[in-house]
C-alpha cells in the first residue's frame, strides 16, 4: 500500500477521535513517510495500520526489545514528544521532511527527553523536547540494531 493509501486509512480510523490532533492537513501522510523511510533504512517492515482508531501504544517499530516511536516533521528544529506521552524506555527517532524527501536526523531515549521542561512549541499542548543538534547519531542506533540481530543468531 502507498504512503498516501496508508495515511488515508489511518485518517479514516481516527475519524471522531477526541485524542487525535492534526496540526497540519497532511499529518498522517507526513508520519507515514517518516515511518516508511526509517523501516527501509533499518530493514524493518511497517506495522499494521490500527484501523480501530485506538492508540497504537506509541510503537512504530521495535529494536533490541525497545519500542521505537518515529516523529516526523516539516520543521525539524526539535524532537517533540507530547507531555504525558513520553516514555523513558522508548527510543524516539526524529525524521525531517523536506517536500517529500525524508532524512533521519537523530534519536534519543525518552528518559532524556523527560528531563526537559515541557513547552508549547506552537502546538495546543506542551511537549518534552530536544534540539536536533543534541540528538544521538542514527549510526549509533543502527549499530545497536545490527548487534541485536547478530545476537539472535
What does each model-found stretch correspond to?
Residues 1-64, 70-153:
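Nucleic-acid endonuclease domains
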Amino acid at each position: 500500500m502507498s504512503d498516501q493509501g496508508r495515511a488515508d486509512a489511518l485518517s479514516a480510523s481516527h475519524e471522531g477521535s477526541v485524542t487525535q490532533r492534526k496540526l497540519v492537513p497532511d499529518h498522517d501522510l507526513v508520519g507515514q513517510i517518516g515511518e516508511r523511510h526509517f523501516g527501509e533504512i533499518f530493514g524493518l517492515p511497517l506495522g499494521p495500520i490500527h484501523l480501530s482508531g485506538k492508540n497504537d501504544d506509541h510503537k512504530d517499530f521495535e529494536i533490541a526489545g525497545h519500542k521505537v516511536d518515529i516523529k516526523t516533521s516539516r520543521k525539524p528544529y526539535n524532537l517533540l514528544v507530547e507531555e504525558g506521552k513520553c516514555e523513558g524506555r522508548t527510543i524516539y527517532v526524529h525524521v525531517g521532511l523536506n517536500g517529500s524527501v525524508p532524512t533521519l536526523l537523530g534519536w534519543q531515549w525518552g528518559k532524556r527527553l523527560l528531563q526537559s521542561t515541557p513547552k508549547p512549541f506552537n502546538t495546543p499542548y506542551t511537549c518534552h523536547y530536544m534540539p536536533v543538534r543534541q540528538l544521538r547519531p542514527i549510526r549509533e542506533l543502527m549499530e545497536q540494531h545490527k548487534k541485536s540481530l547478530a545476537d539472535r543468531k
